[in-house]
A protein has these predicted regions:
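Basic/polar, cationic surfaces and motifs that engage anionic cell-wall
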Residues: 1-328, 364-458
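RNase H-like, Mg2+-dependent phosphodiesterase core
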Residues: 354-355
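Active-site acidic/histidine clusters and adjacent loop/turn architecture
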Residues: 313-349
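A generic structural signal for well-ordered alpha-helical segments enriched in polar/charged residues
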Residues: 346, 350, 417-420
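Glycine/small-residue-rich phosphate/adenosyl-binding loop
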Residues: 358
Length: 458
């Protein structure tokens, strides 16, 4: 390669990372399951004092392994060696539509491999803190919430999410608001690091194989729902709010034993640590475990709203349930659900002449909600009632069959309680099927019968 020719850098997609891991782990090329994690630490994924107390000081700066092309090496270096102030720069788009920071993911994988007996054993921390949670989430949470508490009043401790420039060829990710030390991709990478690290602690597997099984592959694969779309449930089972609170206290205790003590801990007493840990665990659990993930408009490829949206005045008193009828088949992957959203929006804008997709939110059978008009814009879903409630459509025709149990639970047990907790809906809200308020069979006989047993139905 002459110096003038820059290498072709693969897109920032999980598939690119899987190709890199395949090459690094190939026994034919001298690799093993621990190769990628060790390389990651050499490149700087574990740069915080707590992470280094668990995984050790980073090895020297690595050179490009012969198994990787120049473009792959450049991508890996950019993803893992970035400014700690911009953690979202280390993120890739996964096949399920989520954006995953590789740092906490790889740290969790290394902690899991080492607890499972591969490589050097992990140290025993004092006070006893869970090493897997420490390197993925608890140090980051404790740090972020202590800084937010000590900072100016509008300092945020979690979020925001963001948008990719191009979902087919993701290169640049931009946050949609003021940054915090734990933006959504870091929270998601941490949850995945905990879920996969816990799996590896039970026995080593090739990391590429594990990730391929977890995320699925390709944007538009029509296979069923990948395990990664259950990360909130699976993380919650491993680290519920009470456990998370206890582990944030423990990891801050470990940081206090280091020399020098990190700046943000210097004048912090035990009661303050306890209060911060409680706050951090509650906020994290509500945002990332108990509430469903919502795919923003930018990720499914929405066209702009035509004109100026009218604003809702929450909290609202009602939720109206619909089925989309077309597409008649539920969508089980991000690719299929994003396509369904674009089709519905096109039909609503071009055929019906509306300003935008009519629903507030649309529910896929892939484990995600898709933002239509969202929490703030008046929808076009339930004629005569659009300012009084949110319209939620489930992709599919539910005249004779029901959505699968996970999709029903997503709406009944996650979306509705979250809408109340976040102040968008009154606690004594009413739930209606579309047919109760207009001449229509929507949301289909099967679904309408099902929701009559749900809280709030009238």
């Amino acid at each position: 390669l002459s110096p003038a020719v820059s290498p072709t850098v693969p897109p920032r997609h999980m598939d690119s990372v899987l190709d890199i891991l395949d090459a690094l782990e190939s026994p034919a090329r001298g690799g093993s399951p621990g190769t990628a994690a060790a390389l990651g630490r050499g490149l700087g994924i574990c740069s915080t004092p707590g992470c280094q107390a668990v995984l050790g000081q980073p090895p020297g700066t690595p050179k490009r392994p012969p198994a990787l092309t120049l473009g792959q090496w450049q991508l890996l270096t950019e993803l893992l060696r970035h400014d700690p102030a911009t953690p979202e720069m280390g993120a890739v788009l996964a096949p399920d539509g989520s954006t995953v920071a590789l740092g906490p993911l790889l740290a969790g994988i290394e902690a899991g491999l080492r607890s499972g007996g591969l490589g050097r054993p992990l140290p025993t921390l004092d006070p006893p803190a869970d090493p897997l949670l420490a390197v993925t989430i608890t140090e980051a949470l404790g740090t972020s919430f202590l800084l937010a508490q000590g900072g100016d009043n509008n300092a945020t401790a979690l979020g925001p999410g963001g948008c990719w420039d191009d979902v087919e060829n993701p290169q640049n990710y931009t946050l949609r608001g003021p940054p915090s030390p734990v933006p959504d991709p870091v929270a998601i990478g941490a949850m995945d690091g905990v879920v996969l690290g816990a799996r590896l602690a039970r026995g080593p597997l090739p990391v590429a194989e594990l990730l391929r099984g977890y995320y699925g592959t390709g944007n538009g694969s029509e296979a069923g729902r990948p395990p990664s779309s259950y990360r909130r449930r699976d993380f919650g089972a491993l680290a519920g709010q009470g456990r998370l609170e206890k582990e944030v206290v423990a990891v801050l205790g470990v940081l206090r034993t280091l020399s020098p003590i990190p700046e943000f801990l210097r004048d912090v007493g035990t009661q303050e640590v306890a209060a911060v840990a409680r706050w951090a665990a509650r906020e994290f659990s509500e945002r990332y475990v108990e509430c469903p993930a919502i795919m923003p408009r930018c990720l499914w490829g929405a066209r702009p709203y035509r004109g100026t949206p009218a604003l809702l005045r929450p909290p609202l008193g009602s939720v109206f349930l619909h089925h989309t009828l077309e597409p008649a088949q539920p969508c089980q992957t991000f690719g299929a659900c994003a396509r369904a959203m674009r089709d519905i929006q096109r039909f609503h804008q071009d055929t019906r002449g509306w300003d935008d997709i009519g629903y507030s939110f649309v529910v896929g059978s892939d484990g995600y909600l898709y933002e239509g008009r969202g929490w703030h814009w008046v929808g076009a879903h339930t004629k005569g009632y659009n300012t009084q409630g949110f319209g939620v459509g489930i992709v599919g025709d539910f005249t004779a069959t029901l959505p699968d149990p996970d999709t029903l639970a997503l709406v009944r047990d996650e979306l509705l309680p979250c809408a109340v907790r976040s102040g968008h809906v009154w606690p004594d809200f009413t739930l209606h099927g579309h047919r109760q308020l207009g001449h229509t069979d929507c949301p289909g006989n099967a679904l309408f019968q099902e929701i009559q047993s749900w809280p709030g139905f009238q």
